[in-house]
């Protein structure tokens, strides 16, 4: 009996250890998936050799021109010739570290039967330098472009020009370097759906549907409120004007909470960027009408509706959340925008004759 009892304890111990091991391995695997969903491996059209860039910042990592040489023919970096200014290669080192990636060939390979990367990857996503032209139409008939949104650019944010400072850079970093409330959802919904709880409505099912993404605390930014029309955009315009004129900025202090049904069903307008051009028969060129307020007002009015059909928030049990707070539209909208552009007369003419203006 003692032997049998001891043996049963041994089996129980082994079972417990095995269960713990399996649980720990599953937890580690889940953490790895969650982390990679937030920080995926990205291959861009161009890259830079960081080691070359970093080494250019120190004298030991660069080649100086005009320095004396020792008897072995090596540069003497202990000091230059008195009365002479030597050269430290900085920009040339940086440029030599730049590389260009052939993404067209890479995509062909990934889509071919030769590639086995898809077997080991959760998803392969493609992004394009295409941004849907989205407008908000207010009750008074005025229109405001909300994507791409140039509001923060007016404040000197999101740029690296002479007006940018460490303060604006810090602000942009805190906003995730995103100067627009709108952004595209990953094409593979399995990457993010399990990380979020649907608080109202549903996830987008059509190209012209979008979802409001809350922070883990259930909040949206005041910037998003202006984009959605829940706060008067004239208030924001006034702050920008005061800032531009170096005046004291009147910042609103009162903000209220919003019910889900106040966000649900909000509509925006999609405009085909090709439609902002009209052909001039007299000069035989395409002219932009983007600055013509009456033309743009009519164009926006005739645009397709983009509707918020859901509100989501990070699940409190999720170890990571890959979406940022704002308004997310499906990848199918980007595909629609590209197709509509390809079908336009101006693009067809330019494809047939690149010299077309």
Task: Explain the meaning of each model-derived region.
Residues 1, 14, 194:
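Mobile, glycine-rich extracellular loop/lid and propeptide segments
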Residues 1-11:
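N-terminal Sec/SRP start-transfer signal
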Residues 12-42, 46, 50:
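Alpha-helical transmembrane segments
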Residues 33, 45, 49-357:
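Basic-flanked hydrophobic alpha-helices used for secretion and membrane insertion
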């Amino acid at each position: 009996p003692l032997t049998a009892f001891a043996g049963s304890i041994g089996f129980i111990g082994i079972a417990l250890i095995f269960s713990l091991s399996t649980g720990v391995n599953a937890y580690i695997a889940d953490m790895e998936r969650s982390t990679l969903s937030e920080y995926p491996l990205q291959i861009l059209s161009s890259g830079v050799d960081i080691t070359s860039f970093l080494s250019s910042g120190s004298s030991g990592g660069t080649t100086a021109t005009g320095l004396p040489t020792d008897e072995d023919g090596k540069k003497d970096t202990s000091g230059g010739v008195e009365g002479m200014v030597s050269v430290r290669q900085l920009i040339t080192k940086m440029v030599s570290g730049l590389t260009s990636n052939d993404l067209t060939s890479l995509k062909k390979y990934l889509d071919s039967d030769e590639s086995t990367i898809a077997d080991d990857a959760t998803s392969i996503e493609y992004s394009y330098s295409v941004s849907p032209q989205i407008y908000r139409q207010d009750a008074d008939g005025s229109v405001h472009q909300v994507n791409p949104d140039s509001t923060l650019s007016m404040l000197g944010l999101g740029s690296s020009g002479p007006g940018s400072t460490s303060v604006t850079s810090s602000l942009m970093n805190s906003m995730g370097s995103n100067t627009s409330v709108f952004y595209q959802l990953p094409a593979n919904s399995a990457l993010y759906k399990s990380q979020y709880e649907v608080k109202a409505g549903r996830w987008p099912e059509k190209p012209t549907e979008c979802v409001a993404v809350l922070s883990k605390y259930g909040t949206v930014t005041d910037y998003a409120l202006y984009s959605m029309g829940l706060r008067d955009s004239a208030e924001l315009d006034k702050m920008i004007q005061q800032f531009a004129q170096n005046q004291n900025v009147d910042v609103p202090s009162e903000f209220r909470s919003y019910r889900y049904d106040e966000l649900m069903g909000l509509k925006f307008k999609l405009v085909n960027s090709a439609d902002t051009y009209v052909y001039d028969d007299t000069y035989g060129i395409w002219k932009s009408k983007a600055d013509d307020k009456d033309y743009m007002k009519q164009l926006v009015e005739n645009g397709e509706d983009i509707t918020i059909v859901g509100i989501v928030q990070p699940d409190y049990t999720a170890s990571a959340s890959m979406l940022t707070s704002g308004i997310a539209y499906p990848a199918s909208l980007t595909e629609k925008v590209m197709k509509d552009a390809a079908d336009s007369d101006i693009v067809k003419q330019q494809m047939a004759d690149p010299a077309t203006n």
